Regions:
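Right-handed parallel beta-helix
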Residues: 214-356, 365, 469-471
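Extracellular "spike/adhesin" assembly and maturation modules
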Residues: 1-48, 52-58, 68, 87-90, ...
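Acidic Gly/Asp/Thr-rich repetitive segments characteristic of extracellular carbohydrate-active
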Residues: 131-166
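Short glycine/acidic-rich loop motifs that flank beta-strands on beta-rich extracellular proteins
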Residues: 160, 173-175, 188, 194-198, ...
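N-terminal extracellular ligand-recognition/capping segment immediately after the signal peptide
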Residues: 149, 158-199, 204-206, 226, ...
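Intrinsically disordered, low-complexity Ser/Thr- and acidic-rich flexible linkers and loops
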Residues: 210-213, 291-293, 305-319, 348, ...
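Parallel beta-helix/beta-solenoid
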Residues: 179-182, 187, 216, 221, ...
Length: 660
């Protein structure tokens, strides 16, 4: 036990310090007593409270010495009692737990069974099959698919297992079937080289009739390189190949695989999978030999229908759900260019939705169509990815009516457009896109609208190479057509033809963005392209607290929009284009109904006006404008001022325009 220290009286009387020290001593004494009590109780319960050589015996020896003496006497008796070691054999019938077996053989059999059980358990846990043991050729001189399939078949017959393919180059002459409960591990320097017209793996047989997610599941494919062998296209001709085909499955994980030089189709064609993970893999090099598939996806996420995958299973439209795609790289190879699309789909099934899809921390480079294309996907998260040199980075598509994607699973044409909801695009970096950073289209068919609904574009970074204003081509950071309930907030946009394009949208909130150095407008509301009067204009747009610095034309351009609010925006240095035929400035309203422009700060020496509201607009008021330039409000119903009430409490206009 430790030493205990307490305070002594340091004052001459019963004063405040004395009482304080006394209370402190009482508190310390209580703690020390509890500590001693705890140590005593622990000592009583401890298995090693004392070792046997610490305890004295009545003989004068320690307990340890007494035990060793008795053990030596017993050994001597057992070994020498009759000179034949019979007693030693009898003694060996007793095991470590004190169990006495009828014969020594019974004890040996029992112990042997324990050893065998442990061995079998370890084999089950850690054993694997080596592809070389089945005849796979790591030199690539002879085909290896049959040998690898033999190993996979044996694993299947055993109810599951682990196949390892060591380093080397293996010529693959047919597609190999991976069954349920199988793990395939390829060494980092293992190359499966296409040696026929198709790809490498599939998780189904032609005679499988699985539906839903009941197919061959619990599969891991990891490591290695799946090489489409485009360098030898003449020796092994093909027009299209999928490297891996998956369907009707649950719990699939593809990790650390490199897909190289894929031809026309997909690296991974996943249809009707639940709990699909694709991580830390590389998708390098693609070519479209058909000339008809500029949209081909490295990872296709499709419903299980015949037009998507016709290899096995029921064509019941089973969607992918709960998909996690993370830490992957999509780009060029040494031989071929980038993909049409990194992750996406290009068809759908009426009333079936793919949901719960997350794309996190991926690199999409040099995609000629789009880095990511959602097609009627719901509950999507696109987070912390990097997009470089793509034509489009993210395209959000809905299904139109009157096309293949508006048929139900029975093939009946429903003739209706359809949408999914809730796409979150957050924390991504977009560099040097050729057309759009983010592009979304809803669909109108037979006067019915399928909105792109619930898009949230938050905290992203858009950056193009610096150019003089007027030198960009078609690059726009964000374009939304027929979107509803969209939130665009906290984004940073540098460069391009335009910052944001809003067209035929309902309930759009644009807040706290920074837009700099664009050729035309930072925020532009376009006329609706709809000719059916289904969505003739935009409704309910709020443009608040944005920072706009340096535009070729107007900072904010409003037209074809009812019920709009433009509040608390800073607009600087507009009209850099300096058109000789049309004046431009900070905020321009061509037409629209029921708008308000409040608390603007507008500065710059090249603008023609700070704010201009044309007479084609109605019921628009402008108030509390700070900065430089003219505030021009045309039209009888528009005014520079705010609203108050009359003596009898009716709303009325209060003009702030000076009479002088």
């Amino acid at each position: 036990l430790g030493k205990f220290y307490y305070k002594k009286a340091t004052t001459g009387g019963f004063d405040r310090q004395y009482i304080k020290d006394q209370n402190q001593n009482l508190d310390d004494i209580g703690k020390d007593i509890r500590e001693v009590d705890t140590k005593i109780n622990d000592h009583k319960k401890a298995k090693n409270a004392h070792t046997s050589d610490q305890i004295a015996h009545s003989s004068g020896l320690t307990v340890a010495q007494e035990i060793e003496v008795e053990k030596a006497r017993i050994r001597n008796l057992v070994l020498n009692v009759d000179g034949t070691n019979i007693k030693e054999v009898v003694d060996a019938r007793v095991d470590r737990n004190g169990t006495i077996y009828p014969t020594l053989r019974d004890r040996l059999d029992a112990d042997g069974k324990v050893v065998d059980d442990i061995r079998d358990d370890l084999i089950t846990r850690i054993s694997f099959k080596n592809a070389l043991s089945y005849g796979a050729d790591p030199t690539g001189k002879t085909p290896s698919a049959d040998a690898i399939q033999s190993a996979l078949d044996e694993i299947h017959s055993e109810g599951g297992g682990w196949l390892v393919i060591p380093g080397g180059t293996y010529l693959i002459e047919k597609r190999m079937i991976i069954y349920e409960n199988t793990r395939v591990t390829m060494a980092a320097d293992c190359v499966l080289l296409r040696g026929w017209a198709g790809g490498f793996f599939i998780n189904g047989r032609p005679d499988d009739s699985f539906s839903g997610y009941s197919g061959r599941s619990n599969i891991i494919i990891e490591g290695g390189i799946l090489d489409g062998n485009y360098a030898n296209i003449d020796k092994y001709p093909t027009t299209a190949m999928d490297s891996i085909i998956l369907g009707h499955a649950n719990n699939i994980w593809i990790d650390c695989v490199t897909f190289k030089d894929t031809i026309t189709a997909h690296a991974i064609d996943a249809n009707g999978c639940n709990n699909l993970q694709i991580t830390r893999s590389n998708f390098l090099g693609f070519i479209d030999l058909s000339g008809k598939r500029p949209f081909s996806e490295a990872i296709q996420l499709g419903e299980f229908v015949e037009m998507g995958v016709n290899q096995f299973g029921a064509f019941d439209g089973t969607p992918n759900q709960n998909v996690y795609i993370a830490h992957n790289h999509f780009g060029k190879s040494e031989l071929l260019g980038g993909w049409g699309c990194g992750v996406g789909n290009h068809y759908s099934v009426y009333n079936i939705f793919q949901t719960g899809i997350t794309l996190f921390d991926n690199d999409f480079e040099d995609c000629t169509f789009a880095g990511v294309r959602t097609f009627k996907w719901g509950e999507v998260k696109i987070l912390n990815n990097r997009f470089k040199r793509n034509n489009e980075c993210i395209r959000i598509s809905q299904a139109a009516g009157g096309i293949e994607s508006s048929k139900n699973v029975e093939g009946v044409q429903m003739n209706r457009p359809q949408n999914a909801q809730n796409v979150l695009i957050q924390g991504n970096d977009f560099y040097d896109y050729k057309s759009y950073g983010i592009l979304s289209f809803g669909q109108i068919y037979n006067n019915e609208i399928a909105w792109s609904d619930g898009i949230r574009i938050l905290g992203n970074y858009f950056k193009l190479k610096a150019k003089e204003v007027g030198e960009y081509d078609y690059e726009q950071a964000i374009k939304l057509v027929f979107a509803r309930n969209a939130f665009i907030s906290d984004n940073r946009i540098f460069g391009g033809r335009r910052g944001m394009w809003i067209e035929g949208c309902f309930n759009t909130f644009i807040d706290r963005n920074y837009v700099s150095c664009v050729d035309t407008e930072a925020i532009y509301v376009e006329k609706s392209r709809d000719k059916t009067s289904t969505v003739p204009k935009s409704y309910h747009i709020s443009i608040d607290r944005n920072e706009i610095n340096t535009t070729g034309r107007n900072g904010i351009f409003i037209q074809n929009c009812d019920h709009f609010d433009i509040r608390d925006n800073n607009v600087l240095n507009t009209n850099k284009e300096q058109s000789s035929t049309r004046g431009r400035g900070g905020i321009y309203v061509e037409n629209g109904y029921d708008g308000r422009i409040e608390n603007s700060r507008i500065r710059g020496v090249e603008k023609e006006f700070a704010i201009l509201v044309k007479d084609a607009a109605t019921e628009v008021n402008v108030t509390n404008t700070k900065g430089t330039g003219r505030v021009i409000v045309e039209g009888d119903s528009n005014f520079n001022g705010y609203y108050g009430t009359t003596q009898d409490d009716y709303i009325r206009k209060i003009s702030t325009k000076s009479s002088s």
